[in-house]
Amino acid sequence: MEFIDYQAFETAPDNNDKSGTNGEVSLPEPVSRLNISSFSLDYKPLKDNFKLPSILSNVETSLLQTKADVQDDTAMAQKLKKDTSNLYDRMSDYVDLSIQNFGTKNIKDSTPIPEATTRKTLVEPSSIDLEKSNEILAKKLSKVLNEYDTSYHHTIKLRKSLKILEKNRDKLGISEEKLISPDYIGTLARKSLRTDLETQLLKDHVTVLEDFKPIVRRIKRLAAPVQQIENIGEEILKNDKETFSQKYISDIDDCRNHLLKLEIKKKILKALQSKFTLNQLEDDLIENGPLKEEIFDIVDKLTKMKEHATYLLALPNSKAGEVLIKQTNITLDTINKKISNYLIDYMYTFESNSNMGTKHVIDPTERNLALFQKGLVYLSNDIQYYDDFLKRVTTMRSKTLLDEFLSQFGTTSELSTTISSSEDPVRYIGDVLATIHTMIANEVDFVKSLFKFTSEDMDKSSSMIINNNAQYFDGLDLKLVNDIVQYLANSCKLRIEQVIRFEENKVINFEITQLLDLYSSMFVNKGIRDDNPLVLHLIQLRDISEKKIINSLTKQLAETENTQISSPDLLPPQWLSDYLNSITELFDHVERLYGGKRFSKDDIDSDKYMFPYDTLKTVIEEPFMTSLIKQIKDSYPLAKKKEEIRIVMLTLQINCFEMINFRLQPYSLSIFSYDESCKHILENIQHTLDETVEKLQKLQISLLFERTGLNMYYNLMNMIFPIDSIQDEIDYDMYMSLVDNPLMSLENLEKNIHEKLNDYLPQALPDFQDNLLIKLTSPSIADDVCEICFRTLTDFYCIFRRILKHLYPDNKEKVEAILNFTESEFKTLAGV
């Protein structure tokens, strides 16, 4: 309908004109389009309420002026068309410019305003003209439709086309008002619609033709070979009737055989190419592609190529094999470097995420983790890159751990520190070791999530590599953990040693040794080796702390080495009591450590036990059995000459050893049951105490016999036959030789015994208890000494009285007068 222009029908045709076909009215030709390219774009747009001015003087003047401006309007319209995307907008601008241009050129101030009738005639069309125009349009449409193929098939296609237009009305930007508009804008809208439809149709056709391009190119490419085959066929057909000679047949066979050989060579070369070369895609993936599964397939292929290339070395000319192996090694080195860079980037990415506070533990199901582990497996084929990567990991992780550890000792309030001061040495060291243990535990979990895997977790090719390089993967996670945490050893040792060096309290040092033992065991349980510097430093620190305890005890003894320990009350010196307090306090901690008051060498770790025989010998046996006895003897230099001083010395020694034995005896089933040597130390102390008590008893017996006058006779009779060996009266005859001894005469007996015995015996028991044995701190020892002394005296008195009666049977009354106490009376007075 683009040829229908309503401006062509402003004047109704003559009814008498019958020149048209079938009496139809002859329609005028459409007017030519206006040339609007000459219009200038430098104008001010009209206001929306613009009205056509009615001040024209006459119609003819206006029409003449309009014709004069047609050429300028055409140029302006073409320029405007280039700057406006929408046809309707272009036409609206064109109308506005036309009216503006029209008004500026033709409107005069002096032009009289026409009357209403004239204005209506010029501006408003009459109803008669509109009806005539519609009639002409209807006839034209009828003619177009009548000329169209009216078959059912074409009707369906027309209807379908109209429906498609209606369906895509919004997409095509169709405006019905513009399309049916009877003015020039409607004409342009209809032409624009047709242009758009044709353009879209051309695009669809081009799209279809694009699909045929490969086919056309292939046909063109095959045209020449096909033409050549066709020409050869025609030539063969021409010579079909001619007789071929044997030579031609032989040539054909030779050519065919040569062709077969070439085909075989081609197949061999292609097989060799596929076996010993990489394709372009694989080369590009190696040089420019990221690390992914295809890279490992290429590595497997290169490994096989290298293996097969070794067969080429057996050829007479081995240069091809050498070059191939060299090139393969270069390519493998490139891939290994790519894998190494990926693994390092992966670790750095993890470090960055950790520093930003993101998730610290890697998800084992993560795809990148599987790629990381597979890359590590393949990297193990190149030991240099493999070792370099592990060193980078060790350096990176150790620096992170060391920074984290040192950050715990910050002093600013902004830092969240767990270790702030060393006011409590045990707590401080415990916090230090607990921090390290936590870091080790976290590091073990992290390293295991990355580096602990088996051949069962991998695919077939990776499993083969793991099995071939088992020495690199067995215990890899623990090896890395040990290499990483060993960098904490020096910092840990420095922090703990500075506390131990200045700590003098033996109990605190002992608790420190137990902490060090505990955490060294915990570190070992986490996979840290015994020979790791961290564990070795803890053992060294434990030894230092233990030596501090021993040195503190020996120093405590050394300060009292030259002091006099004699005192009027014969009590143990204060330093001995303090020393025993220190020892027993340590023993109590040891018993609590091992869970009770009974344990042996089989129940504890010998390497960590603090009081083996050597230590007990240093802190118990030598100070008491040697130094203490020497000090006591040095305090009483006249003890060898005077029995009274010797008794005082023995009393003091008994008091000291009794206190030592009393304080150490509770540990007989624990500390001193560690082994036989330890038991022997406590037995020696008990033996020394018993021996000293026995010496005191002998001195007290001698003193008692001397004060009763029986001492000389006691010694005399024991020289002949021991009093303790007498069993019955027959043994009395052993002393018959004493009758001839002047000392045994009744007169001398009365002179030497009677008076002393009667004077001292009644007060002997109180004298012993209140004077001689009162300074023994142990009541049981004092009672035992007193009882033994008086029992010995009583036994001798009774036997001596019987022997005298046996020796002097005729003077029994005289004997009874000299030894005037009966046996029962004597026992009563002696308290036996």
UniProtKB/Swiss-Prot annotation:
Entry keyword set: Golgi apparatus, Membrane, Protein transport, Transport
One cellular component term from this protein's GO annotations in UniProt: Golgi membrane
Family: Belongs to the COG6 family.
Function: Acts as a component of the peripheral membrane COG complex that is involved in intra-Golgi protein trafficking. COG is located at the cis-Golgi, and regulates tethering of retrograde intra-Golgi vesicles and possibly a number of other membrane trafficking events.
Primary localization class, coarse: Golgi
The protein, known as: Conserved oligomeric Golgi complex subunit 6
One of the protein's GO biological processes: intra-Golgi vesicle-mediated transport
Topology with respect to the bilayer: Peripheral membrane protein
